[in-house]
Amino acid sequence: MTVSPTTQPQTNHSLPPADAKQRVSQFMQTLQDEICQGLEALDGKGKFQEDSWQREEGGGGRSRVLADGDFLEQGGVNFSEVWGKSLPPSILKQRPEAEGHEFYATGTSMVLHPKNPYIPTVHLNYRYFEAGPVWWFGGGADLTPYYPFAEDAAHFHHTLKNACDQTHGEFYPVFKRWCDEYFYLKHRQEMRGIGGIFFDYQDGNAPLYRGPDPNGPAAQYSNQLAPIEPLGWEDLFSFAQRCGRAFLPAYSPIVEKRRNTEYGDRQRQFQLYRRGRYVEFNLVYDRGTIFGLQTNGRTESILMSLPPLVRWQYCYSPEAGSPEAELTEKFLVPQDWVNS
């Protein structure tokens, strides 16, 4: 049995600056603004409607939704900034040293559900936490196609890898494997999509992988790495900013390439069926959904990630050799998209 290395205590050089919360909060709001502006320009028709909200226990946020656009059937981009007396059990299980401390959390999240089945759904989330003596960054971005286009997957992964490599060359290999592990529907034994990057509890110390599976590919890869020089708070903040700003270059060219592809009822019905997997994941496994519900977050904002239309079909099986069959049989399996 492989045992994950214990995390190192945070040292003075890596402690957050006095204005850390203010700076990260400002960036998360700016990221929301930049993404919304970019998506409105890309869509060409729809406009985001903003809904500001306050949380009784402390904090609040801005929810923005674009519905019935040109390529977007529905998309939401959220900013939130909350604080309180105690982190929920789902996080304390991973960071028990935060127990008994007040917490602060801020982040931006996004889910886009396009109309055209040939344009993939996409998800993004970047977040920052402080709780007493501990702090960390988390987040990632992932792509969920309905029809298999290897060049789209390669472009998305290349763009995220370039953002990761500017901080450390081992970030992408670990966080890509972690993403494959995280966005997996155990009850279906299926990947949700073709992944991207996912990371959590990053405070600049080893190991890079901080997930629940000590024997999985992400943990095995992370554990065999040579010792990595500890990174400071500023390094990780810059990393989060680069990843956040890599989204539009990663996704926009895919939209432009696929938005005018003709489709019929067969493709639309398959898209709605596969959206069911998205709903299942978000309601059963998604860490952000669980955190929001456990901290009395705003339900409308938490469930903003769900598609406007979806369907389930009992014991559905795609036609052998069809693009629909290829999606799950060959495409939605962990693979090296960068070098494929």
UniProtKB/Swiss-Prot annotation:
Inducers of expression: Constitutively expressed.
Residues passing through the membrane, by range:
none
Which PROSITE patterns has this protein been placed in? Answer: COPROGEN_OXIDASE (PS01021)
Instruction: Kindly list the GO molecular function terms attached to this UniProt entry.
Output: coproporphyrinogen oxidase activity; metal ion binding; protein homodimerization activity
Deletion phenotype: Cells lacking this gene fail to grow under aerobic conditions, with accumulation of coproporphyrin-III.
Q: Where is this region: Disordered?
A: 1-22
Q: Report residue spans for region: Important for dimerization.
A: 278-313
For binding a divalent metal cation, which residues are annotated in this chain's numbering? H113, H123, H157, H187
Pfam families under this entry?
Coprogen_oxidas (PF01218)
Q: What is its EC number?
A: 1.3.3.3
Q: How does it assemble?
A: Homodimer.
Q: What is this protein called?
A: Oxygen-dependent coproporphyrinogen-III oxidase
Q: Name the species this protein comes from.
A: Synechocystis sp. (strain ATCC 27184 / PCC 6803 / Kazusa)
Organismal lineage: Bacteria, Bacillati, Cyanobacteriota, Cyanophyceae, Synechococcales
Its gene name is hemF
